[in-house]
Amino acid sequence: MKHKLFVVAALVMLQASPFIPSMIIAQQPTAPFRSYQQARRVLDDAIAAHGGVEALRAIKDFTLTEKGKVYARYQSPTAEQPFAIGTSEETLIVDTDRGLVLDDLKTANTGFNNWIKTVIKGTEGQTFDMWSKTETPIPNASVNNFRGQIRRLPPIVLLEALDRASTLRWLGEDAIGGKKQKVISVLRPDNQLLTLSIDAQTNLLTRYGYLYADPVTGDSEIAQTYSGYRTLGKLMLPKGRVLYNSGGVIQETEYTDLQINTRPADSVFVGPAGFEKLSAPPATPPPPAVTKIADDVYILEGLNGGTHNVLFVAFNDHVLVVEAPEQILYNNNSVQALAKIKATVPGKPIKYLVLTHHHSDHAGGFREYVAEGTTIVTTTETKSFLEKAAAAESSLLPKLASKQLNIETLENKKRVFQDDKHLVEVYDVGPNPHAKEILVVYLPKEKILFQADLLNAAPNGTFAIAQDPTISFSEKLQQLGLNVERIYAVHGRAATPEELRTSIEKRRASDLK
């Protein structure tokens, strides 16, 4: 009872005393709350500068045509800079109100010339290969499939941030191109922490991006910048964009035409007629799995979300592995691969790793093999690439036990591995439009060839027309005189020499010259 009376008396004194500051009684704003408030002011100012929230939310459809350059960072024919420069042309029409998308994209670089049209209507969609004249259904089609492309308009980025306002935080000030920026962050629904840089003078969005672990450059940022804003109705919209990745520019484009709320006719969202109809790929890629394709020869399929495969051979006292794929956003693919390999061939050390070429998605997973004490066998171009990648300082990538890599390169464009039961031959079939030096792995007894990027068969059983790298690959196979019955690939399913020839015949009969 005495305790209760004491508490009541204390409350009365607090309320009555004129000498106790009100701030003691009021809840103090916490650091996260203050950070949110400052970030929210920056975002609100940016939305106002771009036309105001009402005008931004009134965007129901847009038509964007852009033209520019693409830079093949760590995907060029050689490992050294400058990177190969290609071209891109794209028309993107999006009607979010009606769930409609038309994307017409042409790109050309490193021997590949692609022309793809995509049409989405609600939950149905098709991809049209304009050179091969094939039509493929899109599983789980939605306007959100093009969310990344839709963000080419800054108002979309700002509205997404507003819709996640409780996650806004103030990060500080920065400078881009000599101009002061106010920098805030927001957490997207996919848990990606996005950073927005707002011009301190104009309040226009300069840049947005996020940090990630790059298998080549280490700690990096994927970012998109906007410039040359212009007025379109009530809106402020950019004249172009620059996309950054792996420590540098990978695309520069000019917005040659941009229209808002024209309500395109339904007839716009119709693909070409008369194309060969193919079956849809699986809606969800199957998990990585090992298949025995010959005695002591295995293919591990389904890495990188179903896009990459690995070959491995169990010799008498060791294992030879071909390829160490890794995503641009480092995802421990070699950890998965090693676990599968060791479960399939327990007790044998992984002595050799053959890397076909220096591109990041094929060689970026080398670190885990270095930790195993594996000797890497590859080309001089890839050796240079690996040494630079190993030297990259990173707090996000796995630490290398030693930056002294054990790398052996081919002599006279050939290397042979063998014991009394197994024979594996490695050939450099470069120069190729895709890579100056590029290896294929041949198993003479099994009549199996394993290659990367030179012949890509889609899972649904079809072949696109041959691109320049495929034509060069076919010519080199004829010169080598290898007796091949099955062609396995880093990308896609196994193929036959007959399918390779058919792919080349399609190219000769196509409009792509």
Name each model-derived stretch.
Residues 474-513:
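Divalent-metal (often Zn2+) His-rich catalytic cores of metallo-beta-lactamase-fold enzymes
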